[in-house]
Amino acid sequence: MDCTVHSIALNKIVKYFDGQWQGMATASDGACYFGASTHSPLHGASFFKFEPATRKLTILAEDMTEVCGEDRSRTPPQGKIHSPIIECDGWLYLTTHLSNYWEKAINAYTGAHVIGYELSTGRFRDFGVVREGYSIYSAIDVDRINKKLYVFVVPWRSADVENDGSHLYQLDIATGAKADLGRVPPKGRGACIWFFIDNKGDCWFTLWKHHWPLPSDEGDLYQFDARAGAIRCHKGVLPIGLLAPDGAPAPERLRCERSWTWAQPLPGNKQCLFTMGWLGGGDERLWIFDPDRDIESGDAFQPIAYIGATFHSLAYDKKDRVYFVQFRDLNDARTHYSEATRDYVREDIHFNDQLHLRSVSTDPDADGRILDHGRIVDQDNRHISMIESMAADDKGNVFMHGSWHAQSPEEASYAYVWQELLDYLTDLGFPNVLKTLHVAQDHTHKLLHRGQFFSHANIS
C-alpha cells in the first residue's frame, strides 16, 4: 500500500536549501507554516505558508537574515529555523539558529533571534538577539498564562563553551524584556530540543546529550518553577529505554543519552506527549508526562504504545493521533540514520529504505495498535530519503519537509560541504557518505542527487 503525497520542490525557489529539522506547525487559520534551512554562507533560512485547501504556497520571508535586520555580506546568515513553531494570541513564535558550523563563522555570528509573526497582518516582530554570539538550540515555548516565552540559549564560540555554558531565558511578550534564568546544566554545554509548559506556567525540559555528553546528567528532568522563580532538577527520573515491539531493553550504552527527542502538549496543557527515541536513549515508546503525578517514583510517566525508533519525524494532530515516519522494518529504523543514508549511492543501501507514514492513538486506554498508511510516494513517484520536520491537524492533513531524490538539476540541492560535516557523519558510523559528499576543495558547494521538498497528504 502506498501513501501518496503532493510534493513541492523547494530548491526551485532557493538552490541552497539542504535540510530541515523541526520548524513546522499548523496554525489556527488552517495553514501550515514551516522553515527551510541551509548551511550555505550565501543564504539564510526561508519561512513559508501552505494552505492545504488550495495547495497555495506563499514565501513569507525568503531570507530570515533580513527579517533579523542583518546583512549576510557582513555577518554569517541566520541559516536555520530549527526550533518548534508555537502559537499564542494570533501570533506565531520561532527562533533562528546558526548553521555555518566552522570557526570563522562561529566567531562572527551575531546570535540567534526570537521572531514573532502575526497571522492576521503578516507582520514580523524581531525580539532581537537573546544572548550575543549564542545560538538557540533549539527549544521555544510559551507560557499562555503569564504571556512569557522561554528559549534555550547555547554557546558555540570556544571561549564561551569553556567559560560559560547554556542558559534558560524568559522573554516578556508585551515588553520584549529578556531575563536570564540561569545556566543549565550548572557546568558544561547542553542542548534542549523541546519544552513543555504546563497549565501552571512551569517549564519542563530535558537536555539532549548526543552531541555533547554530560556525565552529570543521566536521565534528568528539569523544571523551571514559575512561582518560585527557580530551576529544579529531578535526577535520573526518565524511563529506561525499551524496544518495540515486545519491550526488550535498549542497549546499555544509550542509557546516558536519555532525553526527549519530541514533545507536544495535550489540550489544556496539563500533560504532554513525548518520545525518547533515536539519539535520545533508544526508547521506542510514545509516552504521556503528567507533572501532577509523582515524578520520583516514575508514576508521572505513562507509556501509550510501542511505536519504534523515531527522532523529530512525529506530528500530533491536536486531537487524538500521532503520525510518524520511519523505515518499514523496526530494526532498520533503529539502526540506520536517514540524515546519512539519504546521501548513499544505491549500491550501498542493503536494506529496505522506503519510508512509511504510520500513526497511533493518543488514548492510553486504546490498544496501542499502529496504523501503517503505506510507503510514502509523491505524484511523480520520487523516492523519499529523510523526514525530520512534520505537522498535522485535526482534519486529517499531514505535512512533511524532507529530502527526496531529485528528478532534475533544478530540483536538486546545491549544498555546502565542509570537512567537519564529513567527519561528523563518518564518526557516527556512516563513512559511505564520502562517496557522494566528497569535494576536491574544503568549504564549497556541490549539486547533490537529492533535493528538499515540502509534502502534504490528507489521511482522512
Identify the role of each PLM range.
Residues A9-A45:
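Beta-strand-rich domains and repeat architectures in extracellular enzymes and scaffolds
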Residues T26-D29, E87-D89, V142-N146, I197-K200, ...:
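Residue-level detector of Asp-centered blade-edge/turn motifs that repeat once per structural unit
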Residues W262, F274-G277, A305-T362:
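Loop/turn-rich, solvent-exposed surfaces of beta-rich toroidal or solenoidal domains
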Residues C32-G35, L92-Y93, K148-V151, C203-T206, ...:
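Conserved beta-propeller blade signature
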